[in-house]
Amino acid sequence: FNERVDEIKQNKNNWIVKTNNKNEFTASNIIIAGGVGSFEPRKLSLQGIEKFEGNSLFYSVKNKEEFKNKNISIFGGGDSALDWALELSKFSKITLIHRRNEFRGAPHTLSEITKLEKIGKISIKTPCQLDSVQGDKVIKSITIKFDDGKREKIDTDIVLSFFGLIMKLGPIAEWGLNMNKKTIEVN
């Protein structure tokens, strides 16, 4: 149907249902089949960073061709970060940044990352985190802070962040339904 319910309101003995396509329905009963909700990427927590989203900061890769011949800083230590580091290293300079010393990816992928680091195709920075971002409309460089307090500035065109996904109830949470521990109470 490619239609999402964005709003429901109780009106006397009926429900008014509004969708993202501007359709409106009246129903005597509703069934909410929201599953576990929707998922959103866990975002970088740095004040003001959202202004770079979509132009030089990304939480997913939709078209890898957009990242050709770029200096790319990839944050994360799991399969997504490692897989994209491998793929994008074919045509871009990659800096892989993780808060721990160890990565949590597939063994074969880790082996390939290590090989690429040895030949200079991928630079690995651990254990560290993003400290600041430099740039006006687009990111020009980032500063990372290591666990020992040292900082390092890295010139970069693109920041990719892969810190996993978080569950959101989406619009369901705003419908005014009686909720108990993220579940809807029914009568």
Residue positions per predicted region:
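A Rossmann-like FAD-binding core segment of flavoenzymes
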Residues: 1-19, 24-27, 89-186
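Glycine-rich dinucleotide-binding loop and its adjacent helix/turn
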Residues: 36-85, 90, 186-187
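Redox-cofactor binding/interface segments in oxidoreductases and associated redox assembly factors
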Residues: 32-33, 74, 144, 161
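Flavin (primarily FAD) binding-site architecture
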Residues: 34-48, 165-176
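Short, flexible active-site-adjacent loop segments at beta-strand->alpha-helix junctions, enriched
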Residues: 5, 14, 21, 29-37, ...
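Active-site acidic short loop of glycosyltransferases
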Residues: 27-28, 54, 69, 156
